[in-house]
């Protein structure tokens, strides 16, 4: 039996690869659209909301990037979030432990948000993206998480 690379593989190699990068929920939310490794558009959410260091979901920045690239959310090959929540949480715990007991109040204040929201960003991001694209979650491309310093 022959491998099934043939025509479909060739067609994919000739098409463009569109990747949407997202930073959100910490500070300075933003989005960037890459096509075949080249930056097509990038924007910070604060440029649209006029809220300094806006940490919200970057819906307006995403819309801008998609419009500039003349693509829709479902046309993307990948959506990539700038960090891995579990890795970030581990760094946070290590930092608190290394300074303990000094950061106890800060630690106690940040834990509820981490345990309720930030550890489950994949669900939140997919829901926000589906709402933004007016589509079902299943219609969205693969959502990936990059190492912070690689994104």
Residue ranges with predicted function:
Residues 2-151:
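Short acidic/glycine-rich loops and adjacent helix/strand connectors
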